[in-house]
Design a protein with these regions (language model features):
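Generic hydrophobic transmembrane alpha-helix motif, especially the helices
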Residues: 96-132, 139-140
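Short helix-capping/hinge motifs at transmembrane helix termini and TM-loop junctions
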Residues: 23, 27, 81-86, 114-116, ...
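Transmembrane alpha-helices
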Residues: 123, 127, 160-191
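Hydrophobic alpha-helical elements at and bordering transmembrane segments
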Residues: 52, 56, 60, 90-97, ...
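Transmembrane alpha-helical segments of polytopic membrane transport and secretion proteins
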Residues: 1-13
């Protein structure tokens, strides 16, 4: 614990020192402006013009909407893929193909299709989060212990009971993992 409490400030201090040294070099001064100049620009943007916080809110709104859409579409698609083989046979090859393409590769296509603004941001974030969350939740549903499903069937559980009382609770850790991964992907794609 003691080592960790010193490590973080030490690393930050070393990074600031390296930045300061690099900002005084002839070649590196353009890539690393002095710290005080950076903080001055931040102050000007945040306080004087007030654009900094507005831009942060706008960006996080885009990420939040894209994430929410990815979650709302990803959960049912994942459950349908895991539960019904015909659905899986149709959707899974497409998801496996599309998920290997970096989300940023969609930007030109989306901009051509819908124009510039918040909508293309949301669409690209939605695609990225949808794919990540769908695969994660799908794996969770597929990994539900078969013994639990058989036991519920023997006890007379209908499909709706099976879903609500067995599959959904057993898949909850995967859903939470999908939320964590999806939020990371949303913010990474936003940047």
């Amino acid at each position: 614990l003691y080592m960790n409490t010193l490590t973080v400030p030490g690393v930050l201090l070393a990074a600031l020192l390296a930045w300061t040294l690099l900002s005084h070099g002839e070649v590196t001064a353009r890539a690393f402006p002095p710290l005080m100049k950076v903080f001055g620009s931040y102050t000007k943007m945040a306080v004087d013009r007030g654009v900094f916080w507005g831009d942060i809110v706008s960006s996080l709104t885009s990420a939040g909407i894209g994430f929410a859409l990815g979650f709302l579409f990803g959960v049912p698609v994942a459950f349908l893929m895991a539960w019904y083989r015909p659905v899986r046979n149709i959707i899974e090859p497409w998801i496996q193909f599309i998920r290997n393409i970096p989300p940023l590769a969609y930007v030109p296509l989306v901009v051509i299709a819908v124009g510039v603004g918040r909508v293309p941001q949301v669409i690209v974030i939605w695609i990225a989060t949808f794919l990540t969350m769908t695969i994660t939740i799908y794996q969770g549903v597929r990994n539900v212990d078969e013994t639990l499903i058989k036991a519920a069937r023997v006890l007379g559980a209908k499909d709706s009971d099976l879903f609500i009382k067995v599959i959904f609770p057993a898949t909850t850790p995967f859903i939470l993992t999908a939320v964590r991964l999806g939020s990371s992907v949303a913010l990474t794609t936003l940047i």
